[in-house]
């Protein structure tokens, strides 16, 4: 999958929008993303066509 940048709702910003980089798709609507150097999970909501990145509880530790 080719990486791409997109705006997303960020958990640590209380849902405010910021730019993320989508790195990989790991499920039907589950993605690995990078937000300011932090790899975390993000969900894509097909009803509103927006990403929701969880940079608090969804952090991926390598």
What are these regions (language model features)?
Residues 9-57:
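Acidic, low-complexity, intrinsically disordered interaction modules
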Residues 1-3, 58-62:
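Short intrinsically disordered terminal tails
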């Amino acid at each position: 999958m080719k990486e791409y940048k997109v705006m997303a709702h960020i958990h640590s910003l209380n849902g405010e929008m910021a730019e993320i980089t989508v790195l990989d798709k790991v499920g039907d609507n589950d993605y690995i993303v990078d937000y300011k150097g932090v790899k975390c999970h993000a969900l894509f909501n097909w009803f509103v066509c927006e990403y929701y990145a969880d940079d608090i509880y969804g952090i991926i530790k390598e």
